[in-house]
């Protein structure tokens, strides 16, 4: 046996959780000894759930106050303020996403650790149950051999060798030895009730653990989906998606606090058991198994003497005595009574099988096998199980913090979306630099192309007369130039009216540029048609 398995030592987190003050619902101090049937002890575990409920209430109150203050606060939305709000919302979403991913990672580890611990507990319970069942089967089989099978052989031999009184005395002595074996076997504990309870406990533990593991797995997936979809709503500026996911985030926040309450109560209660498991087992098995036997299996120290040693020794001596008697009858009685050989060989085979069963029973009754299962069960529940519960509690706290952060970022993002839409609505639809107008123009093929100040129609006029006019400043109104633009085939909304209004002269060309300009104008005339 490995040295680490010789003695159970409670880990530090068990000692720390056991030292947590146990208070009832009326704030009275409660004994921390593990007693799940005691109402006051149940109230002390329920009080931990009440603390988690208070934390949830304070969290919701804080979020409500924050939402009200954010929605009612009016601020001047300058360009710098909008940039700051956008940056704040972005970084808040990033931090919340990182917290959510970290929480799910911690939760996966804690869920796996708890599941491993529970499976180790179930495996140890099944092994112990198999050992107890094997003990009962061996005791029952040996009792059957001694009381039924051996009696039948002895009865037939008594009829065969009835003429010899000394042989009859040998048979009676063997019958007495068989009675001693049955008496010693009846003194061994019957584990039937223990195996029934262990089977029930194993099945209940497996059932609860499966749905616990599955519930946390679904909660992890829900947290990730809500966090990712909320970040997607922020990125796409979808108010509907953001609002629905924030509502789901509040639900997940409630589930996180509820899981924290369950984890805290389970961790503290299990730590109370793991602090002194021997005492609890001794107090609850006294009516079924002798306390000396229970203590022998729980402690399994070299200083303890096996309570079954005397019974097993008597069993072994009785079998040895009967084998000697059968050997003498085979040697001396068979020559006189040949028909007795079959029954004597049957008794010899029966005694050999009983001796094999005795060795198996001795190995099963030894404390080392069951004590190892006991230590494995404690390791699974007190080390891996409680450690996983602590990580699950940390997951609940991180998830609550992450979704609280997302909920705080929601109203700011909502106001930012509304202000952005309002700024778009304030822009004139006829403004060519309006992004909405540009999108409409891009999807409307019937709308004419945008012409510059030097349009193709003005180029045609320049071809007819290339002499630069006198550079005079015109004081004509803007509408006159707009009408001129219409006559030349342009769009008055897209002409550079301020340039005309300043009285800027048209472009002039030197004699060297005239052939180049005329060739360009001819090429433009081939691609565009103008009204006559």
Swiss-Prot record:
Keywords: Calcium, Cell membrane, Chloride, Chloride channel, Disulfide bond, Glycoprotein, Ion channel, Ion transport, Membrane, Phosphoprotein, Transmembrane, Transmembrane helix, Transport, Ubl conjugation. Residues 66-87, 235-240, 407-532 are cytoplasmic. A motif (RGD) lies at residues 164-166. One of its GO terms (biological process) is L-glutamate transmembrane transport. Glycans are attached at residues 129, 283, 352. GO terms for cellular component: chloride channel complex; membrane; plasma membrane. Ubiquitinated by NEDD4L, leading to its proteasomal degradation. Ca(2+) binds at residues 113, 116. Pfam families: Tweety. It catalyses: chloride(in) = chloride(out); L-glutamate(out) = L-glutamate(in). The keyword Methyltransferase does not apply. A motif (PY-motif) lies at residues 506-509. The modification Phosphothreonine is found at residue 199. Belongs to the tweety family. This is Protein tweety homolog 2. Changing residue 164 to A: Significant decrease in hypo-osmotic solution-induced chloride conductance but no effect on cell membrane localization. Calcium-independent, swelling-dependent volume-regulated anion channel (VRAC-swell) which plays a pivotal role in the process of regulatory volume decrease (RVD) in the brain through the efflux of anions like chloride and organic osmolytes like glutamate. Probable large-conductance Ca(2+)-activated chloride channel. GO terms for molecular function: calcium ion binding; volume-sensitive chloride channel activity. Its main location: membrane. It is found in: Cell membrane. Disulfide bonds join 274-382, 300-367. It is a multi-pass membrane protein. InterPro entries: Tweety. The chain crosses the membrane at residues 45-65, 88-108, 214-234, 241-261, 386-406.
